[in-house]
Amino acid sequence: MLDKLFGNETLAMIFLNLFHYEEVYSGLIEKNTGTGSRAVLNQLNKMEEAGILVSREVGRTRLYQFNPKSPFIKPIKEIINITYSNMSIKLKEKMFKERMRPRAKGKEVIK
């Protein structure tokens, strides 16, 4: 559904990954979606140039996140939240395989 709204499946998957993790590197998106690195980097660069995303370097890794100063972020996040909240836990576990930090014992796997 998001691919039809945003006009691009790669962009839709990038937005879902950003919504889930809040901050991601391109390799994680590639791993989670099975999309090629060139396609992911092209979309990330376009969104950064448009002011939708911002990035920072940590060592040799570039981390991307939504630009909190952009007026478009709130409506974009609301659209993504509708899709994300309607996804089953199994689908979320399948799509977002990598954990960003350890989970406390007894805590839910997906928010």
Language-model regions: role of each:
Residues M1-L11, Y25, V58-I80:
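Short, cationic-aromatic polyanion-contact patches
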Residues A12-L16:
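Pre-recognition alpha-helix immediately N-terminal to the DNA-recognition helix
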Residues F19-Y25:
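Short capping segments at the starts of secondary-structure elements
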Residues L28-N32:
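A short acidic, leucine-rich amphipathic alpha-helix
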Residues R38:
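Key DNA-contact positions within bacterial/archaeal DNA-binding proteins
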Residues L44-N45:
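Short, hydrophobic-biased segments on the C-terminal half of alpha helices
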Residues E48-V58:
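A short, conserved structural fragment
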Residues P71-K111:
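Amphipathic alpha-helical dimerization/coiled-coil segments
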